[in-house]
Amino acid sequence: MTNITIYKSNDLNIGFKVFGHSGYDEAGKDIVCAGVSALTINFINSIEEFMDDRFVVTTNEEDGMIDFKFETEPSKESQVLIDSLVFGLENLEQDYKDFISIEFQEV
């Protein structure tokens, strides 16, 4: 199961943690893991490439863990990007609820 925690502050999405492997299929064939990875890595790369917002990211490939947090309140543009990420992850969860779990945590 891939567990996802969306960090919130004052009703804004400010980060996330993805942990675990979905178990949908074996490594290299797991479309659920591939979808989660594509969404999260593209989000981080987009923030890094196109935005000035500062962030901290920690990863552990073995555990399938990515932990991302903005250091300050994100710009409006970055907020749109993270809201889009959450939207995409929630859509994956709807289609693959036995393999993805999303929770929201106030920080």
Enumerate the predicted regions with their spans.
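A short mixed-secondary-structure module that forms the rim of ligand-binding clefts
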Residues: 34
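N-terminal intrinsically disordered, cationic/polar leader segments
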Residues: 1-31, 41-107
